[in-house]
Amino acid sequence: MIWKRHLTLDELNATSLNTMVAHLAIVYTRLGDDVLEAEMPVDARTHQPFGLLHGGASAALAETLGSMAGYLMTRDGQCVVGTELNATHHRAVSQGKVRGVCQPLHLGRQSQSWEIVIFDEQGRRCCTCRLGTAVMG
């Protein structure tokens, strides 16, 4: 397991209370050896005006996952801040849920890079994101 902090899924989800993460109904669903996953509904909260998943909602899911994964890689007295987010949208989603899967690309002392892939309920890749974070403290 790569994580330096050891939190349960319940503890991870508790960090979302009264935040945009809760408003978008993003829920952490899996913490594996080197992977963090979350789900987000595709509904009125996350739609753009034409009834499809908003690209900004996908970006919010990606940044949520990458930032939390980055935090899990820090020690006491440290935190991470996002420095860059890139998202490539591959497929539209109009309903159901999407699942984000976050894995590290680079884990340095001062910077991290994360890949977040978003899948629809049929397991099709809908969006590929890369998040850069800086380690503070």
Curated annotation (Swiss-Prot):
**Mainly localized where?**
cytoplasm
> Keywords on this record?
Cytoplasm, Hydrolase
Q: Which InterPro entries match?
A: HotDog_dom_sf, PAAI_dom, Thioesterase_EntH, Thioestr_dom
Q: Which residues form the active site?
A: E63
A single GO BP term for this record reads: enterobactin biosynthetic process
EC number(s) per entry: 3.1.2.-
- Molecular-function annotations in GO: 1,4-dihydroxy-2-naphthoyl-CoA thioesterase activity
Pathway membership of this protein? Siderophore biosynthesis; enterobactin biosynthesis
**Which compartments is it annotated to reside in?**
Cytoplasm
According to the UniProt entry, where is the signal peptide?
Answer: none
What's a Pfam family this protein contains? 4HBT
Q: Which domain of life is it from?
A: Bacteria
**A GO cellular-component term linked to this record:** cytosol
- Coiled-coil zones: none
Q: Does the keyword Protein biosynthesis apply?
A: no
Quaternary state and partners of this protein? Homotetramer. Dimer of dimers. Interacts specifically with the aryl carrier protein (ArCP) domain of EntB.
Q: Which HAMAP family does this one have?
A: Thioesterase_EntH
Q: What does this protein do?
A: Required for optimal enterobactin synthesis. Acts as a proofreading enzyme that prevents EntB misacylation by hydrolyzing the thioester bound existing between EntB and wrongly charged molecules.
Its family remark reads: Belongs to the thioesterase PaaI family.
Would you tell me the protein name for this molecule? Proofreading thioesterase EntH
What organism is listed for this UniProt entry? Answer: Citrobacter koseri (strain ATCC BAA-895 / CDC 4225-83 / SGSC4696)
Gene name for this UniProt entry: entH
